[in-house]
Amino acid sequence: MNINDKIGIYPGTFDPITFGHLDIIKRACKLVDKLIIGVAENVNKHTAFDTKLRTSMAENEIKGLGIDADVISFNGLLVKFAKEQNASVIIRGLRAVSDFDYEFQMSWVNYKLLPEIETIFLPASEDTQFISSSFVKEIARLGEDVSKFVSKGVQNELINLNRIKNGE
């Protein structure tokens, strides 16, 4: 790692990590010298999986794909985390216009807090543009196959989660 290397942060809740997230991660790696996947510990957002497991799932997914990136959990302001990691860019994926509205507002706030950190938006690929962690969890909760949206390892975690919730 060189002192002049461009470090990017791809933040998210990753509850769970999906093929859509992995698509953005693969593409983001081409844009920066080092990518950090920031697993957000968001106290205002109820997650199905705890931060440790979400971080572990992300680590397993990128390792399985041979992606050279770090996975680090964080809480608090994203721009503060980015600054702590010496990142110069935040990378966000966009699925639909509704994502853009929210993400554009957040990028403005982040810019006001730390103007030296830029935000890059990557549109979702056509085959992943409508995958969301919420949809995946609901489909899995109903006992349906989610293999088109997440890896086998994540599927197994969803099955375990639903067994626990159902008292099995």
From Swiss-Prot:
Residues annotated to bind ATP: 13-14, 21, 93-95, 103, 128-134
Pathway noted in the entry: Cofactor biosynthesis; coenzyme A biosynthesis; CoA from (R)-pantothenate: step 4/5
Top-tier EC class: transferase
Reaction(s) the record says it catalyses: (R)-4'-phosphopantetheine + ATP + H(+) = 3'-dephospho-CoA + diphosphate
Location(s), subcellular: Cytoplasm
Record has Transferase as a keyword: yes
Site, Transition state stabilizer: residue positions: 21
Gene Ontology biological-process entries: coenzyme A biosynthetic process
Alphabetical list of SUPFAM superfamilies matching this protein: Nucleotidylyl transferase
EC annotation from Swiss-Prot or TrEMBL: 2.7.7.3
InterPro entries tied to this protein: Cyt_trans-like, PPAT, Rossmann-like_a/b/a_fold
Gene Ontology cellular component terms for the protein in this record: cytoplasm
Chain residues that bind substrate: 13, 45, 78, 92
Molecular function terms, GO-annotated: ATP binding; pantetheine-phosphate adenylyltransferase activity
Keywords in alphabetical order: ATP-binding, Coenzyme A biosynthesis, Cytoplasm, Magnesium, Nucleotide-binding, Nucleotidyltransferase, Transferase
Reported cofactor(s): Mg(2+)
Role, per record: Reversibly transfers an adenylyl group from ATP to 4'-phosphopantetheine, yielding dephospho-CoA (dPCoA) and pyrophosphate.
Subunit structure: Homohexamer.
Entry's family note: Belongs to the bacterial CoaD family.
Protein name stated in the entry: Phosphopantetheine adenylyltransferase
Species this chain originates from: Wolbachia pipientis wMel
Record gene name: coaD
